[in-house]
């Protein structure tokens, strides 16, 4: 099943071509810039379109062959779209705070996930015998785990691909992925370095509408990959995940 594509017009409509002020640029992004206007760098969307298509194809193929995608975006305007896209496509996410060692120290993280699940089970069952204070303490611990680990609770191991919004903010996550040889797909604004990004997608990483467009595209790529995998195995596709309403995806 073919991966989705994102049109030039959809990127323009979302403001994906607007970079940062020219004095805030990272010179390593020069090859991806069209020029500047009124002191703002303009990203070359003629490169973004094929690079996005390449990244979406990677994600679709990865999921089709049983791989896992980790969505990472902890900045305010990315938190909701990241979580929604990952949930809708049956993938995994970190949208609150990247914990050091989240991938490179997976054994410790997996033990924390076990504790998190045990707390959920305990609190959803009979809490008879516990004081109100004890229940409150356990609830607070559970909620803290939910924020940091809720999106990866069912990942079951390190991911096969990482998708990142804002490579500057998620520098630690990218470093861990690089250490483990996990390919990174990242939206790169004019103020970031493309170093360590195997699948760069030059585009604005601040505009809420643009972020939602990218997340929906990646979710759709993962969904189509999963459908393709089921199809290859001869499984029923009747329960396929609902496609996004964004008409920019083809």
Curated annotation (Swiss-Prot):
CDD domains associated with the record: RPS2
InterPro entries, alphabetized: Ribosomal_uS2, Ribosomal_uS2_bac/mit/plastid, Ribosomal_uS2_CS, Ribosomal_uS2_flav_dom_sf
Gene Ontology CC, one term: cytosolic small ribosomal subunit
GO molecular function terms listed in the Swiss-Prot or TrEMBL record: structural constituent of ribosome
Keyword Ribosomal protein on entry: yes
Region described as Disordered: 225-250
Keywords: Ribonucleoprotein, Ribosomal protein
Record-level GO BP terms: translation
Entry annotated with the keyword Ribonucleoprotein: yes
NCBIfam families: rpsB_bact
Family membership noted in the UniProt record: Belongs to the universal ribosomal protein uS2 family.
Protein name stated in the entry: Small ribosomal subunit protein uS2
Gene name of the record: rpsB
